[in-house]
């Protein structure tokens, strides 16, 4: 087994997030729409107040995340974000700050992505991104180390066929609110035998062959990795899941320290890491489409675009 070389790579992301279900951004409320119609000086004053109230700060997540890099790019690309800063910490800290702001109906701008339970729990919206810094709709890809097809043809076939919908991932995350991810994944597999049968059709069982799946510490990826784990284990594999920073994920697969990953967000979020190691791994294509990243605000905030934010004084 290509067991991950922890000490040599030296970065471990052992976060335990509570992402349970995803959704898309909500439409503006009637009050928000009416306020926006006023336009003029009132709108300018409102956005200026919002920007100063949050001290020209975007509440971000982990420094190594792709969305963190994209937000840094936005701070450069948008002239009106001159003087703004991104405050990085952790996904859990961002979610706490978002919840506190909403409880007090205060302004906040966070880095967000979907699928994510925050859109189901709160009334949120993505800010429009006229410059396209955050890209459009994303997909999640499957990558494997070179030689996996020859070494583990059965696992390769299953991973190559693995494809599901955002609603499938959402159902696992929702179940994982009350039970652990492996049990939630087993529940999904039990309820979706036709889909699993398509992945495993004609695949011969193995006898305890070890395989390591590398993932990022988002619960979206914990969902896909655990479902793949259950399916591979049913075929006789001994599966290890290794959560790491995104850059390490690509390095692990490129260098053969991990066997496969169902976690890369493309074409924007993990583009830099993908390009750094391109050609050193095999890309099996999309396993989920319809993902998105961007700047997110509560719907009660009277702004709709990144360009509505005011430069720092």
Task: Describe each PLM feature range.
Residues 105, 118-131, 271-284:
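Ligand-binding "clamshell"
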Residues 223-305:
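Short, glycine-/small- and polar/acidic-enriched structural segments
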């Amino acid at each position: 087994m290509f067991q991950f070389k922890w000490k040599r790579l030296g970065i471990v992301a052992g976060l335990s997030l509570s992402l349970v279900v995803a959704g898309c951004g909500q439409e503006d409320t009637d009050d928000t729409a009416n306020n926006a119609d006023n336009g003029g000086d009132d709108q300018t004053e409102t956005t200026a107040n919002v920007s100063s109230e949050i001290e020209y700060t975007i509440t971000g997540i982990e420094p190594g995340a792709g969305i963190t890099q994209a937000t840094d790019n936005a701070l450069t690309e948008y002239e009106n974000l001159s003087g703004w800063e991104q405050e990085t910490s952790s996904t859990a800290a961002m979610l706490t700050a978002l919840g506190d702001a909403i409880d007090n109906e205060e302004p906040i701008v966070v880095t967000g992505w979907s699928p994510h339970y925050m859109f189901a729990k709160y009334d949120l919206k993505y800010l429009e991104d006229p410059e396209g810094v955050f890209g459009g709709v994303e997909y999640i890809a499957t990558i494997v180390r070179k030689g996996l097809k020859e070494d583990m043809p059965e696992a390769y076939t299953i991973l190559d066929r693995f494809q599901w919908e955002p609603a499938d991932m959402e159902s696992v995350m929702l179940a994982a609110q009350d039970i652990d991810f492996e049990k939630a994944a087993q529940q999904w597999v039990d309820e979706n035998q036709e889909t699993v049968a398509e992945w495993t059709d004609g695949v011969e069982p193995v006898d305890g062959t070890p395989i390591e799946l590398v993932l990022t510490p988002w619960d979206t990826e914990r969902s896909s990795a655990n479902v793949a784990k259950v399916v591979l284990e049913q075929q006789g594999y001994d599966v290890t899941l290794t959560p790491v920073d995104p850059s390490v994920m690509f390095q692990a697969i490129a260098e053969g320290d991990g066997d496969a990953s169902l976690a890369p967000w493309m074409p924007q979020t993990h583009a830099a890491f993908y390009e750094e190691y391109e050609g050193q791994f095999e890309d099996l294509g999309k396993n989920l489409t319809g993902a998105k990243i961007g700047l997110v605000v509560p719907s009660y905030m009277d702004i709709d675009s990144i360009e509505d934010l005011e430069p720092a004084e």
